[in-house]
């Protein structure tokens, strides 16, 4: 097993893993890269989603006559939703039970549910390592860009305690239209010829003043 930083498409493994939702959308992140590189795979994926056959916890293998081998691994129901840790665990169990029958001899995984999914490598990395480390095939796991080297080691992944309380990724906060007023103030301040540009401290002061004046910014 190798824990790597880099581009999964540079892998020499026979099978690549793609993270997907269950509604037929590959609009950003690694899924968009897979869509652009393998349009036929995407067409099949959309058809399977429309028929309700793509479900969390149940990855599936796409393989064509040219040798392309891709596991589409659902980490969330809807593309708008965060990824769920339980879907990662269930999907890894599926892989443990299925890789041999599918003829998979080498496989490269992305950091499942991290990035746009909102899950943390500190949780996902150890879970992936423990689920895959004993399988007798070549396995590469690509960590998120910027992951410290010490968190790529087997020692870290073996002994890290997964925070099972973090069952799903970070949720998107509903947009508050009062934030547009904050942005307008920031814009006007930045356009002042002799004013300092807005940084963290000035931004906090703007939010404080607007909140104190009765604007429902949602900040306390």
Question: What function would you assign to each model-found segment?
Answer:
Residues 1-181, 188-204, 208-212, 216-220:
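Macrodomain-like recognition of ADP-ribose-binding/processing modules
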């Amino acid at each position: 097993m190798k824990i790597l930083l880099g581009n999964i498409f540079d892998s020499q493994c026979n099978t690549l893993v793609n993270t997907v939702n269950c509604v037929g959308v590959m609009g950003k992140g690694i899924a968009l890269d897979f869509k652009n590189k393998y349009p036929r795979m995407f067409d099949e994926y959309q058809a399977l989603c429309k028929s309700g056959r793509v479900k969390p916890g149940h990855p599936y293998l796409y393989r064509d006559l040219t040798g392309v081998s891709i596991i589409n691994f659902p980490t969330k129901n809807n593309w708008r939703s965060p990824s769920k840790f339980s879907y990662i665990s269930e999907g890894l169990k599926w892989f443990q039970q299925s890789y041999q029958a599918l003829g998979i001899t080498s496989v490269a995984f992305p950091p499942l549910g991290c990035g746009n999914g909102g899950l943390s490598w500190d949780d996902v990395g150890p879970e992936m390592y423990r689920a895959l480390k004993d399988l007798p095939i070549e396995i590469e796991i690509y960590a998120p860009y910027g992951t410290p080297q010490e968190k790529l080691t087997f020692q870290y992944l073996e002994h890290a305690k997964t925070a099972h309380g973090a069952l799903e990724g970070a949720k998107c906060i509903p947009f508050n239209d009062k934030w547009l007023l904050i942005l307008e103030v920031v814009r006007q301040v930045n356009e002042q010829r002799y004013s300092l540009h807005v940084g963290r401290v000035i931004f906090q002061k703007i939010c404080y003043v607007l909140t104190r004046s009765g604007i429902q910014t949602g900040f306390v």
